[in-house]
């Protein structure tokens, strides 16, 4: 169920009880003998058994941990899912999901994805006999044309990283499931479950680099996977234990804490992201702004149909050359030049040289990841300070004629 939000600006209404669930699901003090209101960090690697083979829910911390259990329950609720599994990183989650397949199976991956996902599929998974096809899944007909009898998994991001194409999740799910037993995975890192719930739109798996918005404080590396299908959950739980790429209890504690302010943070990210996008769109030294929340985005109407809002991810092309982009980035004072995204602090980066350097240059050219494409992760600072910083950096990159740099 969803509740109405007068400030939704034409987007879907926010998911009902989101804040309450983020604060309370999986956190019941009654589960601890101490009645701790905040779930404690359970660092023990092993747990006492009452008799051989008789345990109270936990045996060995790789297989299950009380702190991780609290986090997984909370995320499942926020994703509108029955189950959630936590992993050591987003890529650890990706690797585990890929282990659902066998040699000879085909993966169809959105052509515009996180550079680490592209690298793993292209340079690692393909070496183990998996067939990888990169397709522009924003065009449903191209996706359907790429499906073969060997297709077992379709992997999409929406919005994509970094060019922010938006994919019709419901449309993809209809096509994918029409062709048989194919798993549809949506990397929901850019949106978080606060703004988008892929499972409700027909996806089989909703996954995250929890390093980003879910944790939100740039101090945890983690991955999360949410599912509704019991058999799929059982297979993934087996692989989670067998492959062993699980997060530490401390990281689980921190991410669980981050969830408590997710709803508040995402609203501020949306507000600041929109302000930055509008400012850049009106700036004469900006060639083009890509932000799904702007009416100028080619898939803005689709965004409003499947999302409750947008985040702080803003992509734009600065006018000029690589030199102009570098001068802009070097002159930023509030935005930090760094990779990653989704933290409380504002970041800026040059994907062609940083996060997407592992993507083949020809592919970058086709995707539009040029030397003048800049990706911003707009944080929670005061709006006027963010705009002032962008303004002075743009002026440094494009000084008025007659001035000296």
Curated annotation (Swiss-Prot):
<dbReference type="GO" id="GO:0044540">
    <property type="term" value="F:L-cystine L-cysteine-lyase (deaminating)"/>
</dbReference>
<dbReference type="Pfam" id="PF01053">
    <property type="entry name" value="Cys_Met_Meta_PP"/>
</dbReference>
<feature type="binding site">
    <location>
        <position position="339"/>
    </location>
    <ligand>
        <name>substrate</name>
    </ligand>
</feature>
<dbReference type="GO" id="GO:0051289">
    <property type="term" value="P:protein homotetramerization"/>
</dbReference>
<dbReference type="GO" id="GO:0070814">
    <property type="term" value="P:hydrogen sulfide biosynthetic process"/>
</dbReference>
<dbReference type="GO" id="GO:0080146">
    <property type="term" value="F:L-cysteine desulfhydrase activity"/>
</dbReference>
<dbReference type="GO" id="GO:0098606">
    <property type="term" value="F:selenocystathionine gamma-lyase activity"/>
</dbReference>
<dbReference type="InterPro" id="IPR015424">
    <property type="entry name" value="PyrdxlP-dep_Trfase"/>
</dbReference>
<dbReference type="GO" id="GO:1990830">
    <property type="term" value="P:cellular response to leukemia inhibitory factor"/>
</dbReference>
<keyword id="KW-0963">Cytoplasm</keyword>
<comment type="pathway">
    <text>Amino-acid biosynthesis; L-cysteine biosynthesis; L-cysteine from L-homocysteine and L-serine: step 2/2.</text>
</comment>
<dbReference type="GO" id="GO:1904831">
    <property type="term" value="P:positive regulation of aortic smooth muscle cell differentiation"/>
</dbReference>
<dbReference type="GO" id="GO:0030170">
    <property type="term" value="F:pyridoxal phosphate binding"/>
</dbReference>
<dbReference type="GO" id="GO:0004123">
    <property type="term" value="F:cystathionine gamma-lyase activity"/>
</dbReference>
<feature type="binding site">
    <location>
        <position position="119"/>
    </location>
    <ligand>
        <name>substrate</name>
    </ligand>
</feature>
<comment type="subunit">
    <text>Homotetramer. Interacts with CALM in a calcium-dependent manner.</text>
</comment>
<dbReference type="GO" id="GO:0019344">
    <property type="term" value="P:cysteine biosynthetic process"/>
</dbReference>
<keyword id="KW-0443">Lipid metabolism</keyword>
<keyword id="KW-0112">Calmodulin-binding</keyword>
<dbReference type="GO" id="GO:0043123">
    <property type="term" value="P:positive regulation of canonical NF-kappaB signal transduction"/>
</dbReference>
<protein>
    <recommendedName>
        <fullName>Cystathionine gamma-lyase</fullName>
        <ecNumber>4.4.1.1</ecNumber>
        <ecNumber>4.4.1.2</ecNumber>
    </recommendedName>
</protein>
<dbReference type="GO" id="GO:0005516">
    <property type="term" value="F:calmodulin binding"/>
</dbReference>
<keyword id="KW-0225">Disease variant</keyword>
<feature type="modified residue" description="N6-(pyridoxal phosphate)lysine">
    <location>
        <position position="212"/>
    </location>
</feature>
<keyword id="KW-0663">Pyridoxal phosphate</keyword>
<keyword id="KW-0456">Lyase</keyword>
<dbReference type="InterPro" id="IPR054542">
    <property type="entry name" value="Cys_met_metab_PP"/>
</dbReference>
<dbReference type="GO" id="GO:0070062">
    <property type="term" value="C:extracellular exosome"/>
</dbReference>
<comment type="similarity">
    <text>Belongs to the trans-sulfuration enzymes family.</text>
</comment>
<dbReference type="InterPro" id="IPR015421">
    <property type="entry name" value="PyrdxlP-dep_Trfase_major"/>
</dbReference>
<dbReference type="GO" id="GO:0042802">
    <property type="term" value="F:identical protein binding"/>
</dbReference>
<keyword id="KW-0198">Cysteine biosynthesis</keyword>
<keyword id="KW-0028">Amino-acid biosynthesis</keyword>
<dbReference type="GO" id="GO:0005829">
    <property type="term" value="C:cytosol"/>
</dbReference>
<dbReference type="GO" id="GO:0006629">
    <property type="term" value="P:lipid metabolic process"/>
</dbReference>
<feature type="binding site">
    <location>
        <position position="114"/>
    </location>
    <ligand>
        <name>substrate</name>
    </ligand>
</feature>
<dbReference type="GO" id="GO:0019346">
    <property type="term" value="P:transsulfuration"/>
</dbReference>
<dbReference type="GO" id="GO:0047982">
    <property type="term" value="F:homocysteine desulfhydrase activity"/>
</dbReference>
<dbReference type="InterPro" id="IPR000277">
    <property type="entry name" value="Cys/Met-Metab_PyrdxlP-dep_enz"/>
</dbReference>
<dbReference type="GO" id="GO:0006534">
    <property type="term" value="P:cysteine metabolic process"/>
</dbReference>
<dbReference type="InterPro" id="IPR015422">
    <property type="entry name" value="PyrdxlP-dep_Trfase_small"/>
</dbReference>
<dbReference type="GO" id="GO:2001234">
    <property type="term" value="P:negative regulation of apoptotic signaling pathway"/>
</dbReference>
């Amino acid at each position: 169920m969803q509740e109405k939000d007068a400030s939704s600006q034409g987007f879907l209404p926010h998911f009902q009880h989101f804040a309450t669930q983020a604060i309370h699901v999986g956190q019941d003090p009654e589960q601890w003998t101490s009645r701790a209101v905040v779930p404690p960090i359970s660092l023990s690697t092993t747990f006492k058994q009452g008799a051989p083979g008789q345990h109270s829910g936990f045996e060995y911390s790789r297989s299950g941990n009380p702190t991780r259990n609290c986090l997984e329950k909370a995320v499942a609720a926020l994703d509108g899912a029955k189950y959630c599994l936590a992993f050591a990183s987003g890529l650890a989650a990706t690797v585990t999901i890929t282990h659902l397949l066998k040699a000879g199976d085909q993966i169809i991956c959105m052509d515009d994805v996180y550079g680490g996902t592209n690298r793993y599929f292209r340079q690692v998974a393909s070496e183990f006999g998996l067939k990888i096809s990169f397709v522009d899944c924003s065009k449903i007909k191209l996706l359907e044309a790429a499906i073969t009898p060997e297709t077992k998994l379709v992997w999409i991001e929406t919005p994509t990283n970094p060019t922010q194409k938006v994919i019709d999740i419901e449309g993809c799910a209809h096509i994918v499931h029409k062709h048989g037993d194919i798993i549809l995975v949506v990397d929901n890192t850019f949106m978080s479950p606060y703004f988008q719930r892929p499972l409700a739109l027909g996806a089989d798996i909703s996954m995250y680099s929890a390093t980003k918005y879910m944790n939100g404080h740039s101090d945890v590396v983690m991955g999360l996977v949410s599912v509704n299908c019991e058999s799929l959950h059982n297979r993934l739980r087996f692989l989670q234990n067998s492959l062993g790429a699980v997060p530490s209890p401390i990281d689980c504690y921190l991410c669980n804490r981050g969830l408590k302010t997710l709803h508040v943070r995402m609203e501020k990210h949306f507000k600041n992201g929109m302000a930055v996008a509008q400012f850049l769109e009106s700036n004469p030294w900006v060639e083009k702004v890509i932000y799904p929340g702007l009416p100028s985005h080619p898939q803005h109407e689709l965004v409003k149909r499947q999302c409750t809002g947008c985040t702080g991810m803003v992509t734009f092309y600065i006018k000029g050359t690589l030199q102009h982009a570098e001068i802009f980035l070097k002159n930023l004072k509030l935005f930090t030049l760094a990779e990653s995204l989704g933290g409380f602090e504002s970041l800026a980066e040059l994907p062609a040289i940083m996060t997407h350097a592992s993507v083949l240059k020809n592919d970058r050219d086709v995707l539009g990841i040029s030397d003048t494409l800049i990706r911003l992760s707009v944080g929670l600072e005061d709006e006027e300070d963010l705009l002032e910083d962008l303004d002075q950096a743009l002026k440094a990159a494009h000084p008025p004629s007659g001035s000296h740099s």
